[in-house]
Amino acid sequence: NILGEEDDKFWHDHKGASINAIRNTTLIKNADILIVKFGDQYRQWNAAFDAGMAKALDKPIITLHDNKLNHALKEVNQAASASCRSVEQVVNVLSYLIDGTLEKQSLNVAE
């Protein structure tokens, strides 16, 4: 623990969140594009917060999530420059942004 041990879980989490906020804010400020991946667990709240920060900093956002989260993330997707449902779509968007490549890329990823 960087800031020392805590017996109380609240203060343990508070200290960790404070350090993470510094790290995440710095990384987002230095990013050209933010790719935000949402899942089924509580961490999607952190992802939504990071997306909001990126939007406030006028950073382009690409979201990545399953179709079952479409409704829950409709406002986040509206704020994003692109909303993807697969890693392959994210790669295709980035390929187009970086070198103008429009042809579909094929990934050899173990599922």
Predicted feature locations:
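Conserved catalytic or regulatory cores that recognize and/or transform ribose-phosphate-containing ligands
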Residues: 1-111
